[in-house]
């Protein structure tokens, strides 16, 4: 099966490229990092910042579902109602959220 002249030329160039040295590899990745990666990170940071500014920071309305926040016995630390990793800004108690949020 004969190859077309264009396919033969392309095959020779690709074969020659694989035989060549790796001198420009680090330079290529350095250019790609500065031209693509850093601006990409900047765009992602700007997107996250704009979404944070548009986001409502009020907690959702508390609904006391009976299957959540069940306390059959108190926790062995503190007042017994707060888990070890309790966060007053995000975690609700069985009676609702604690105090005002900022």
Curated annotation (Swiss-Prot):
Record topology, Mitochondrial intermembrane segments: 51-102
GO process terms (BP): mitochondrial electron transport, cytochrome c to oxygen
Entry keyword set: Membrane, Mitochondrion, Mitochondrion inner membrane, Oxidoreductase, Transit peptide, Transmembrane, Transmembrane helix
Region: Disordered, residue numbers: 1-25
Pathway terms, separated by semicolons: Energy metabolism; oxidative phosphorylation
Membrane topology recorded in Swiss-Prot or TrEMBL: Single-pass membrane protein
One Gene Ontology MF term: enzyme regulator activity
Topology Mitochondrial matrix: residue spans: 15-25
Location of the transit peptide in the chain: 1-14
UniProt-annotated location(s): Mitochondrion inner membrane
UniProt superkingdom: Eukaryota
GO cellular component: mitochondrial inner membrane
Main location: mitochondrion
Subunit structure: Component of the cytochrome c oxidase (complex IV, CIV), a multisubunit enzyme composed of 14 subunits. The complex is composed of a catalytic core of 3 subunits MT-CO1, MT-CO2 and MT-CO3, encoded in the mitochondrial DNA, and 11 supernumerary subunits COX4I, COX5A, COX5B, COX6A, COX6B, COX6C, COX7A, COX7B, COX7C, COX8 and NDUFA4, which are encoded in the nuclear genome.
Function text: Component of the cytochrome c oxidase, the last enzyme in the mitochondrial electron transport chain which drives oxidative phosphorylation. The respiratory chain contains 3 multisubunit complexes succinate dehydrogenase (complex II, CII), ubiquinol-cytochrome c oxidoreductase (cytochrome b-c1 complex, complex III, CIII) and cytochrome c oxidase (complex IV, CIV), that cooperate to transfer electrons derived from NADH and succinate to molecular oxygen, creating an electrochemical gradient over the inner membrane that drives transmembrane transport and the ATP synthase.
Family classification: Belongs to the cytochrome c oxidase subunit 6A family.
UniProt-recorded name of the protein: Cytochrome c oxidase subunit 6A, mitochondrial
């Amino acid at each position: 099966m004969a190859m077309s002249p264009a396919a033969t030329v392309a095959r020779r160039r690709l074969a020659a490229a694989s035989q060549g040295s790796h001198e420009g590899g680090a330079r290529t990745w350095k250019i790609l990092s500065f031209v693509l990666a850093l601006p990409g990170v900047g765009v992602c940071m700007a997107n996250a910042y704009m979404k944070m500014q548009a986001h409502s920071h009020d907690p959702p309305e508390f609904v006391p579902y009976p299957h959540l926040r069940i306390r059959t016995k108190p926790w062995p630390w503190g007042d017994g109602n707060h888990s070890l990793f309790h966060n007053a800004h995000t975690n609700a108690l069985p009676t609702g959220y604690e105090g005002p949020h900022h």
